[in-house]
Amino acid sequence: MSAVNNACGRGDVISYYSWITDDSKIPLVQSQKESVGDRIVLNWVIPDVSPGAGGHTTIFRTISHLERMGLHSRIYLFQSTRFSDDQDFREFLKKYFSEALNEPSVEAYISVDSMTYAHATIATGWQTAYFVRRFNNTSQKFYFVQDFEPGFYPVGSEYIFAENTYRFGFKAITAGDWLKDKMRNDYGMEAESFGFSCDRSIYKPRERSDKKERLFMYARPVTSRRAFELGLLALNEIYKKRPDIEVIFGGWDVSTYDIPFKHKNLGTVQPEDLAKAFSECDICLVMSITNLSLMPLEIMASGSVCATSYGENNEWLLNDENTILFNNDPADICDKVIYYLDHPDLLAKKREAGMKLALSTDWEKEARKVYEFIVSSLSA
């Protein structure tokens, strides 16, 4: 989307992006610092939120774990017009994120205008980093990095705006080792990572309804980094060789696309239904051009096999033992999928290794890494 379109169709680029050039500093308020007390307080600045958003779910889950570990969190929305007041926002969180954000002592506010001193202030998206850069009413600044956000845009202004935030001098808390290494090596940031897990009360093996060959594809045509077109071309090649195969699409409504093979269009789907779909499939395709998503572990825990691309962005967690890895080429994806469908014994080994990996993960253990990084940084 162009900057002009982003600017509400008015071409008012300067006004729309005024927060990028705003260099007014928010100073330390000593009286607020002295009144906080001994318990460590964290300010989290988050972008606008919609029901079930994956990135926000990970943030809220981390906040809940940290709250139980003794770090008190306040959540502040940056540039949101969705809510009428703080209570409206809190009711929204309770309705849509109660499983992830399950500590009632966590505070939530609709605007950074009310933000007061905290020991640490944490940016959670590139837009929020611009506010945190000028917020000096804090002792330490962190950046909760879940993906390489410049990659969300064509090379241009917004790519640059996003990339520049990695040079603001914050300490990075990254989702996985690929981002940790990238923040350290490419931008000189001090960084620590946390790993992934999944909700095993939802994502678990289920008995299949039949033995029909079936594939799942995570379909997000509105999200370019999920490479929908690449996946669709690959599935069409598979269909030519396996005309009886069935495909399940989940993630977005694909009814407006010409799809010549038999398929089921789940559209946007609740986690329970997604887990059931995984369990019905031999192989689940997840295109991941930037950072790995949580979905591979969810697929594995559901008793299916994940297929995704080679690359450091994925292989910090996945490997050839637990995953079908392919080159980002329709022909190679087709060949790999057909090969493992033709060799069910080898597919079963990957399924077993994937389940073992999924069962070895734990969200609390990963949150402990975040806790230790924050506490050690504050005491340094």
Give, region by region, the residue ranges found by the protein language model.
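A charged, aromatic-enriched C-terminal amphipathic alpha-helix characteristic of glycosyltransferases
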Residues: 342-376
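Membrane-proximal helix-turn-helix segments that form the acceptor-binding/catalytic region
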Residues: 108-117, 155-172
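Conserved catalytic-core segment of nucleotide-activated headgroup transferases in glycan assembly
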Residues: 58, 77, 182-189, 193-264, ...
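Acidic anion/phosphate-binding donor-loop and adjacent secondary structure
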Residues: 21-31, 150-156, 192-212
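Short acidic/histidine- and often glycine-rich active-site loop of Leloir-type glycosyltransferases
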Residues: 298, 310-325
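Acidic donor-binding loop of glycosyltransferase active sites
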Residues: 279-291, 304
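Short hydrophobic beta-strand element within catalytic cores of glycosyltransferases
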Residues: 305-309
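Conserved acidic donor-binding segment of nucleotide-sugar-dependent glycosyltransferases
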Residues: 320-331, 339-344
